[in-house]
């Protein structure tokens, strides 16, 4: 019996050891300082600030007003709100706050990914064209220097950039507090660490900046539950890594209750598995063919939910083996 369990446990344990060493080693590069960088604060780039909102009348006005207070020339950026299948006053409140509002109604293609794809197409048809788009959630607040930091990164040639995801409400409940801590940790031991050693980070759904050249050339096309992860991997296949802007800060609202956090995590996990199933093979082939460590590292990013599953499976196998061992010992002792 133990031989069969060994056949299961040894590969599992080897994988767990590999990922543990990987995460442990990677974290050190995010704990001890940051990669030196020269910042370019000469305002050169133009931005389309896009907010996809579904029934967000309670918060959309505050975000639009906040975006108009950024430390960046007003004529270099415009604020667009996509009122996506809204049944409340989101569009009206956004207009009153000064945003350019587009209303979208589509019962067949629902979700943020579809709304973004729809809005990008309209951006490209406008007379005014922008150097980059920045995407936010309706419940966000944005640091005044956000666009200055993104402008600096774009001027240095970066094309796909994720900003620092801070917490808007860490003290509201213990759930929001735990979420906030997890994001603070991940920002340093994952995103910053990867940026410091030249690996690709990952888009986080909000606070992200995308060069319009990328969108024109490759399209958006990311419409699954985790459209940010999907586009990250799509871009990586095209040789475009995601960089990390540690000083471009966005304050994101975290879940307040256990059920809110559960539903959010479940949605993220479903989307993560979906993207992993579609992109791991493609990334592996490209990474091996080109001997590209950045692309191969993207596989580890996608493998995270499987790693958690392996931990659960390992615990289950150990528990079963322990119970069976006790039963066998009991039978031998009293035989």
Where are these regions (language model features)?
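A conserved acidic beta->alpha catalytic loop
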Residues: 83-91, 106-108, 141
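Acidic helix N-cap motif at the loop->helix transition within catalytic regions
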Residues: 61, 88-95, 103, 145
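Cell-envelope/extracellular polymer assembly enzymes that use nucleotide-activated donors
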Residues: 45-48, 78, 230
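Short, acidic, metal-binding catalytic loop of nucleotide-sugar glycosyltransferases
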Residues: 65-76
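Short beta-strand-to-loop acidic/aromatic patch adjacent to the donor-nucleotide binding site
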Residues: 127-141
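Basic/Trp-rich segment in TM-proximal cytosolic loops or flexible interdomain/linker regions
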Residues: 1-9, 13, 30-41, 197-199, ...
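Long helical/loop segments within the catalytic core of UDP-sugar-dependent glycosyltransferases
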Residues: 105, 109-128, 144-225, 266, ...
